[in-house]
Amino acid sequence: MAELTPEDIRSFSYLADIGGTEKAFSIPLIYHFLIRFLSPLVRFFFNINYSGLERIPRKGAMIVTSNHVSNLDPIFKILAVRRQVFYLAKEDHFKKQPNRFIMKSNGMIETLRSEGGRDALSRAHDVLSSGFALGIFPEGTRSRNKKPPFLQNGKTGVARLAASFPDIPIVPICIIGSREVMPPGANFIRFWKAIDIHIGVPVTFGEWLVSNDGGDFSK
């Protein structure tokens, strides 16, 4: 596999056209307590099965991606990663209390779609620059597709962030079963359902660029 030169990396970072706000990103204190409280609670109410946990980096910046079919998906991803994950979230989640308080106190990043989400991507840049884990759903919202594998077309945000940080690992996660627990439009949670969470092999944007199964820029 060919390797990218420093000049190549700078070129792709420039083309991604994402810059941070130059403000350091810190972990809200309440987030530490929430994860400790939430983990045993969720494990009590759901039968969660994990595979590939050893593939998740225990420290350093990374981008965590997955499919998105339920409002509970971010929680399941955080429990799988076993460290704080900061998400991009649509502005609707910030409009009313107590949702706004919960989102802000856990470092979630409000995405203003009227502005194309640029401010949110800049803060996401800050998360990665600070060495933290960024959670993002490539589809941009919960999928309403009713046919397996319940996917819809993705957005460009995750690709632009990955191009801005070609050496940061992207961890793919597949969540199976959360749609049965709380599908889009549902107001109630169905407890004691089985949730399967599969963690794939991490890959960096730089590795993808020169891979035969990716960008194949090595030729």
What are these regions (language model features)?
Residues 77, 102, 126, 158-164:
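Hydrophobic/aromatic ligand-binding patch that stacks against planar heteroaromatic rings
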Residues 58-116:
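Catalytic core of membrane glycerolipid acyltransferases/transacylases, capturing the structured
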Residues 46, 114-118, 151-152:
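A conditional alpha-helix N-cap/helix-loop micro-motif detector
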Residues 109-123, 128-129:
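Helix-adjacent hinge/juxtasegments
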Residues 61-63, 133-135, 169-171:
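Residue-level preference for the first positions of well-ordered beta-strands
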Residues 148-215:
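A cross-family acyltransferase "interaction/gating" segment
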Residues 127-159:
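Catalytic-site beta-strand/loop segments enriched in glycine and acidic/polar residues
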Residues 2-55, 76, 83, 97-106:
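A transmembrane-helix-recognition feature enriched in membrane-embedded lipid enzymes
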